[in-house]
Amino acid sequence: YGGYRYDGRWRPIAERLAAHFGLTNGDRVLDVGCGKGFLLYELIQVVPGIEVRGLDISEYAVQNAKPEIQKNLEVGHANHLPFADKSFDLIISINTLHNLYCYDLEKAFKELERVGKKKYICVESYRNEKEKVNLLYWQLTCEIFCTPLEWQWWFEKMGYTGDHEFIYFE
């Protein structure tokens, strides 16, 4: 996270998420694996009056978050979300869940379902050996390397009801 600086790249993603999920004033959004909170910062710019929270395993990321959003972030793990059942209108987790071990991934899916009304996750995946090699070289913290079909198996096994996307390293 040391070289990860705010550059505005999350604005278009925040706009698409807000439009797709119909986010409005008063909605509550949780970002699991929020890093320094840049996406959450953009969400409060795009949807005034939205309430955002972020959770990240990195104490460094939370301590060095964008000042305008830092008070909304806390250190924690995806396998234990310290929030009440269905307390968020939307849970986002982008490029995070593949960093968990299988036993933590199972708990994380259950927690996402428990805490969120709507959910959106994006995970790294591969469709061929070239993409797998690229993923192996790029992702230093990845613990789970799954094809889209294998991720689909996880989604079904865990009863995941939210939206999902894959990112590939072509």
What is the meaning of each model-derived region?
Residues 92:
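A conserved beta-strand element that flanks and buttresses the S-adenosyl-L-methionine
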Residues 1-21, 25-32, 36-82, 100-107, ...:
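Class I (Rossmann-like) S-adenosyl-L-methionine-dependent methyltransferase catalytic domain
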Residues 96:
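Hydrophobic adenine-recognition pocket in adenosine-nucleotide-binding enzymes
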